[in-house]
């Protein structure tokens, strides 16, 4: 942990800050010409597995945007490979699991003893941490147990999560075994990132919004809480837990014990924070598509979010999901600058 007193880390802990910190999910991506140039040489997975290149991509984006944190360049699905579930990226389709899980026997065969084989991610974290030192914190991350399990079972993206829910409802013991194995791998994987210099860990639960509150509490909350507690025990860095389409789940997500809850754009920030009883920090929550809007509209929406935060310690400005391809880079830069300037004028030091 190289930047424990940074604006971003202090906000994660709901400590007073001089202005609202800002960073963006998928801030290194195809919308940037520098990233596209790297992708002409390497595939996404090749970048992830080359620490020098992953670090370069991470650093370039953070410096170009002048944000308050650098999130390591990696992919959510990397842990699947070391568990014995190969995947590849299909043009136009995204990730494809070559042999999806369909039964308990397949779950039993999954390995949990190879998390250290993902050490190339930790090596990239170290390079980024060494580069920035105390100037800029580094965010490590992993996918949440539910979202990764969904990929493993569906074999890729899904509209109705039929196979996931069939296994969850019909084979609850096998389902819990799968999530337990994921927790074992993910806790080691993220702990290695922290040892390498990550100041914060974000857990991405991108698909959790497909669940009812009842199903989330019964089938997902216990193992997700286990992951958060394991990380807090072994690393003592703040944990951000982010899900999409999750407004109805927010009170339950708070029970994981994560220090920060990420909001998507579907719930107003002030309402989302109220649902969380203002007991945690929050991150969000601009609609990524607004980055395509003309500046007056984009500025107005960002201003609204900052006003909804109402000067409370613990707000980190971000999008409600990742930056989209073809997003105008200048809009992202202008937004980061505006958040810095407007939030410092709006609230000053927060007590």
Curated annotation (Swiss-Prot):
It holds the Pfam family URO-D. Gene3D superfamilies: 3.20.20.210. It is an enzyme of class 4 (lyase). It comes from the Bacteria. InterPro entries: UROD/MetE-like_sf (IPR038071), Uroporphyrinogen_deCO2ase_HemE (IPR006361), Uroporphyrinogen_deCOase (IPR000257). Substrate binds at residues 26-30, 75, 151, 206, 321. Keywords: Cytoplasm, Decarboxylase, Lyase, Porphyrin biosynthesis. It is found in: Cytoplasm. Its EC number is 4.1.1.37. The record marks 75 as: Transition state stabilizer. GO terms for cellular component: cytosol. GO terms for biological process: protoporphyrinogen IX biosynthetic process. Disulfide bonds: none annotated. GO terms for molecular function: uroporphyrinogen decarboxylase activity. Coiled coil: none annotated. Pathway: Porphyrin-containing compound metabolism; protoporphyrin-IX biosynthesis; coproporphyrinogen-III from 5-aminolevulinate: step 4/4. It catalyses: uroporphyrinogen III + 4 H(+) = coproporphyrinogen III + 4 CO2. Catalyzes the decarboxylation of four acetate groups of uroporphyrinogen-III to yield coproporphyrinogen-III. Homodimer. Belongs to the uroporphyrinogen decarboxylase family. This is Uroporphyrinogen decarboxylase. The gene is hemE.
């Amino acid at each position: 942990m190289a930047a424990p007193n940074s604006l971003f880390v202090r906000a994660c802990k709901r400590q007073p800050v001089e202005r609202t910190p800002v960073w963006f999910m998928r801030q290194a991506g195809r919308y940037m010409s520098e990233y596209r140039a790297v992708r002409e040489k390497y595939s996404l997975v090749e970048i992830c597995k080359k620490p020098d290149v992953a670090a370069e991509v991470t650093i370039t984006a953070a410096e170009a945007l002048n944000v308050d944190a650098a999130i390591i360049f990696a992919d959510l699905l990397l842990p699947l490979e070391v568990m014995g579930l190969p995947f590849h990226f299909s043009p136009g389709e995204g990730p494809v699991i070559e042999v999806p899980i369909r039964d308990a026997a397949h779950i039993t065969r999954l390995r949990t003893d190879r998390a250290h084989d993902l050490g190339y991610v930790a090596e990239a974290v170290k390079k980024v941490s060494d580069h920035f030192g105390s100037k800029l914190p580094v965010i490590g991350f992993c996918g949440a147990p539910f979202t990764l399990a969904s990929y493993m079972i569906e074999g890729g993206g899904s509209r109705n999560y039929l196979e996931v829910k069939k296994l969850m409802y019909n084979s609850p013991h096998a389902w819990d075994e799968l999530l337990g194995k994921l927790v074992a791998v993910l806790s080691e994987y993220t702990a290695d990132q922290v040892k390498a210099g990550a100041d914060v860990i974000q857990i991405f639960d991108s698909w959790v919004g497909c669940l009812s509150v009842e199903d989330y509490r019964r089938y997902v909350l216990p193992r997700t809480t286990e992951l958060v507690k394991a990380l807090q025990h072994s690393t003592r860095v703040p944990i951000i837990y982010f899900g999409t389409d999750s407004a109805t789940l927010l009170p339950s997500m708070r029970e994981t014990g994560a220090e920060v809850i990420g909001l998507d754009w579907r719930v107003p920030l002030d309402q989302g924070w109220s649902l969380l009883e203002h007991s945690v920090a929050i991150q969000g929550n601009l609609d990524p598509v607004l980055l395509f809007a003309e500046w007056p509209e984009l500025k107005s929406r960002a201003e609204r979010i900052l006003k909804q935060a109402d000067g409370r310690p613990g707000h980190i400005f971000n999008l409600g999901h990742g930056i989209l391809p073809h997003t105008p880079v200048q809009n992202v830069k202008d937004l980061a600058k505006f958040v810095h300037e407007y939030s410092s004028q709006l609230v000053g030091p927060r007590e």
